[in-house]
Amino acid sequence: IDVSTGGGEGAHGVQARAGQGEAYPPTPTTSFTQPIGMAATFDRELIRRAGDITGKEARAFENAVGKSGHCRLAPTVDMCRDPRWGRNEEGYGEDPYLTGKMASEYISGMQDEHNYDGTPIVPGGRGDRIRTGAVLKHFYANNQEYRRAYDSFDVSDKVKYDYELEPFRYCAQEGHAEGVMTSYHE
């Protein structure tokens, strides 16, 4: 197994800039409208195409620089339930169904799963090769600002299962996300 390198942000395209602990020059990449704006279109194909370009640029960056292309920290699947949360623009809104479906399309575009031998993937199945891995953010209920790195954010079971976890389920089952970034909860 070859060495795998972590990635940078990718919520609305590949973030490939210097000064974040990486020793490479700034690299021009495509920057899309923030996910909250793209989700407002309800256009799943648009989201998939944005993910496709993000995945291609991440892989090209990995091939050229040798860093940060094997995975990207995206999409943000947190629910945008409080307008004071400073990262609402990274999410897809306050509806778990819309968020799950849109984020799954972005993942599918980024990862571009396929089989080494060229055979098609069975619908709903997994390929044996991906372009770049999607890492979901932030599992789960990470949408509070005050003391978010220190306090646990507790929710009722109904909110937990019907609201907060639902988009993550879509992303795991339909999008086949490769990883999950956790939040700070107990």
What are these regions (language model features)?
Residues I1-E186:
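Glycoside hydrolase catalytic-domain context in secreted enzymes
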